Regions:
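N-terminal binding-site loop/beta-alpha segment at the start of enzyme catalytic domains
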Residues: 1, 9-13, 26, 65-71
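Active-site mouth loops of central-metabolism enzymes
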Residues: 1-13, 48-57
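Glycine-/small-residue-rich active-site loops that bind phosphorylated ligands and cofactors
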Residues: 4, 20, 112
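CE4/NodB-like, metal-dependent polysaccharide N-deacetylase domain
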Residues: 11-31, 96
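Beta/alpha (TIM)-barrel catalytic core signal, keyed to glycine-rich beta->alpha loops juxtaposed to Asp/Glu
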Residues: 36-168
Length: 168
C-alpha cells in the first residue's frame, strides 16, 4: 500500500487523504491505525518473538503527523487496532506531551477470545481508551454457524484454517 507499510509521515498523510476520497467526505470522525508497524504476536501467535525487523520507534513521529492532520480538520479523533499493551502505553506516554491521544482500540474480543483482558483491559481502563470489540461473535462460531464442527465452504474458518485455534 502506498509504496510500503511504514507509518511514516508521508504514508499517514497519503492514507488519510485516500480515505477521505474513498469516503467522499471532508473529515473522518475516528481514524484508526490498523496494524502496528513492528511485528507483534497477533492472530493465534501467542508467544513474543523478538524480530530485528526494520521498524523504527517512531511513536512520537506518528502522533506528530496525526496531530497536524487533526489540526487541519481532516480527522477528529484517533485510535489503534491490533495493538498490544506495550504499544498502547507507548502511544499514551507520548500523548502526555501535548500530542493527540488514542481514544480507542479495536482488538479481538469475544466469549471465546478474551486475550484483551490480559494486560490491555487495565491500561484501557486507567488511560480511558475505549475498546471496539473486533469479531465479538468469534468469526461466526458463537452464532451456531459451525454446528457439530461442520465448516461451510468459503466461510472464514474454511478460508483461514489457522484461525480455528484462535477462536475456540
Amino acid at each position: 500500500l502506498r509504496g510500503g507499510s511504514r507509518l511514516s509521515r508521508k504514508h499517514i498523510m497519503q492514507a488519510a487523504d485516500d480515505s477521505l476520497k474513498r469516503l467522499q467526505t471532508d473529515y473522518i470522525d475516528l481514524y484508526q491505525l490498523h496494524w502496528p508497524e513492528r511485528i507483534t504476536n497477533t492472530f493465534g501467535n501467542r508467544s513474543f518473538q523478538y524480530a530485528q525487523d526494520s521498524w523504527e520507534d517512531n511513536f512520537m513521529q506518528v502522533l506528530e503527523k496525526l496531530d497536524k492532520i487533526i489540526k487541519s480538520g481532516k480527522i477528529r479523533h484517533i485510535g489503534l487496532s491490533n495493538e498490544n499493551p506495550w504499544g498502547i502505553m507507548k502511544f499514551v506516554e507520548y500523548s502526555k506531551n501535548g500530542l493527540p491521544k488514542m481514544i480507542t482500540i479495536q482488538n479481538p474480543y469475544s466469549l471465546l477470545n478474551r486475550l484483551f483482558e490480559v494486560g490491555s483491559t487495565e491500561i484501557c481502563k486507567y488511560e480511558n481508551v475505549g475498546l471496539l470489540a473486533y469479531s465479538p461473535l468469534a468469526f461466526g462460531v458463537l452464532t451456531g454457524k459451525y454446528f457439530n464442527n461442520k465448516i461451510p465452504k468459503n466461510s472464514r474458518l474454511d478460508l483461514f484454517p489457522t484461525l480455528k485455534r484462535y477462536n475456540s
